[in-house]
Amino acid sequence: KYELIVLATPTSTHYSLAKFILNGSFNLLVEKPLCLTVKDHSHLNSLAKKNKVKLFIDFPFIFSGSINYVKNVIKNKKFGKLKSIESYREQAPVRTDTNVLWDLSIHDVSIIEYLIGSSKLKITNIVKKEYEKNNYSEVQINLSDNKNLNIFIKNKWKSPTKIRLIKFVFDGATIYCDENESLYKIKIYKSVKNRFNQF
């Protein structure tokens, strides 16, 4: 018997194929997004519990060293309270089987939930730019949690440059986490009397 099946097919096929695999009592790893509706998502979760198998979604960035460094900083309050997060993820292949929310924004949300240890994020504002009916190529999202943390996410497929940047603002410093950097993915700017010193 297989220990795990990996599903990496067009998004529109995820629900039906995942349902078939889970009903066969196999552990399953699905390439994001899991499916296209909350209803289908809930049903797959229920199937996994019913068949006593595990259902995973592919969120690779939560395993990166730079993201886990920031998680440590937040946990230990090294620079005081975390006040805001800004995440920018731009330039990726335009897809017809899903939209930019499910393709890119889902990464930022998974990273932020992992870092702050909360899945109770609330959307306070969202701006979407369509390139065809019901398919979004660009989004800007404002989120908040129950600790008054301000969160901003901007994603777009079409961009002249590839951007994978998250900015974390603390009481005592600002951290830039840039996954595009090959060497120094983390840059820290410490607040000193209304100015910033890099260290």
Regions found by a protein language model. Give the residues of each.
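Beta-loop-alpha module in the N-terminal Rossmann-like domain of NAD(P)-dependent dehydrogenases
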Residues: 1-47
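Alpha-helical elements of Rossmann-like donor-binding domains used by nucleotide-donor carbohydrate transfer enzymes
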Residues: 4, 16, 20, 43, ...
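A short helix->loop->beta-strand "cap" motif at the edges of active sites that frequently abuts
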Residues: 24-26, 51-54, 148-149
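C-terminal helical cap and adjacent loop that interface with cofactors, partners, or active-site loops
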Residues: 195-199
